[in-house]
Structures are given as C-alpha cells and as structure tokens.
A protein has these predicted regions:
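An acidic/histidine-cluster motif and surrounding catalytic segment
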Residues: 1-72, 76-208
Length: 208
C-alpha cells in the first residue's frame, strides 16, 4: 500500500490521541510510514465535521497534484489476513478507477448485490462508511465539485459518495483490508460494532 498510494491521510480528533496512537501501530504493521495525521474538524453535529474533514482532504490532495489519495479514519483496523487480499486485488485494479474502498458496509436489505468486476474486486453500487477509501487524482476535481454541491443538504459524506456510484468506477476490495473497530463513535455518540465482513458476506450470499 505504501507504494501504491501517493498520499495517505488519517483523520483524527485532537481529543482522541489514543486513536492516533492505535492507528499508527496498525499502519506500522502494514509498513506504511508516510501517513499524515489530519486534525479532524470538530463540529456539532459531529457528522458535519466528518463531512468537512473529508472534503478538506480532497481539496488538499487536489491542490498538491496527488496521483491518488488514501483516506483513513482513526478507527480503521487491518484484518489479520489483509496482505494476500491486497496483493491479489491490486493486480486487478484497472488504471481508470475513480474510487476504491478498502473497507465498507453494504445495505443488509439489498436485493441486488454488487457484482464482481474481478475475483477480488466488487463494482460497488451501494456501500457506506468512509473509514478506508481512496480517490484517483483524475477524479478529485469532479468529486470535490459534487461534494460541495451537497453542503447544506444534511446528508452524511458516505451517503453522498454512494449516490454517485452508478456513474463512476467505484470498487470494493474483497476480502476487505480494513474494518471499523468496535467502540464509542464520536460521530454517532454511541458504541458501535458494524461487523463489516459478516455484513458483506451476508449480502453477497443471500442474493446468489
């Protein structure tokens, strides 16, 4: 991952140094040394700060001329078997990708699962969460324009993204590389445990 992604950012609230310490250990495990901490924008409600934080990183990456950017949230944790999945999936990613999700959650009520674009890549049609995803540099300007058009609509950033999937090349790595660690969510204000891999397998299996 270190060599594939041009820029890597981790969104972290100033009041959560514990999470920054924890995610650094995760990245060290993956031999990622160039990740940069991005101080999360604190707002009330918290999801607004999340929205603005992601937008700010997109704008910074575009301004820096990034070839691509990987954005992580500070509760992203690697699956123990992430490496074989990454080694396989990176060979299957075409050069014309727009977004790649390294972790995601699917609608459990979905009647139409995301199709496989390759053995280790799903062509996403409906996925949520923003704890681990990447954006191709060529798509940054269009994505920024689209996200800015959603300001004031009271729609969380992950939903804003997902509504664009039908028009772009958005892929999900399968099996996933990152999950969102169970624990207290500063955005939702409660303890969460999304059981990501179980969720994705459930949706894929029930629709086969």
């Amino acid at each position: 991952m270190q060599n594939f992604f041009d820029y890597i950012y981790v969104i972290n609230l100033d009041k959560r140094p514990d999470r920054w310490t924890k995610v650094q250990k995760q990245l060290e495990y993956a031999c990622i040394t160039k990740a940069v901490r991005f101080p999360a924008i604190a707002k009330n409600p918290s999801w607004v700060g999340c929205f603005e934080s992601h937008l700010a990183i997109l704008q910074k990456a575009a301004g820096d001329g990034a070839k691509n950017v990987l954005i992580l949230e500070d509760d992203a944790e690697l699956y123990s078997n992430w490496l074989p999945s990454w080694q396989a999936s990176r060979k299957q990613i075409d050069a014309d990708w727009d977004m790649i999700y390294l972790g995601f959650n699917l609608n459990p009520d979905a009647n139409l699962p995301p199709p496989f674009a390759a053995p280790n890549l799903l062509r996403l049609n409906d996925a949520l969460t923003t704890h681990a995803y990447a954006v191709n540099g060529k798509y940054l300007a269009k994505l920024i324009e689209y996200v800015k058009s959603a300001i004031g609509t009271n729609i969380p950033i992950d939903v804003v993204y997902s509504r664009k999937f039908g028009e772009i090349k958005a892929y999900g790595i399968y099996p996933m590389l990152f999950y969102q660690a169970p624990g207290f969510s500063d955005i939702l204000g409660c303890v969460t445990d999304f059981q990501f891999r179980q969720n994705v397998d459930h949706v894929l299996n029930k629709c086969r």
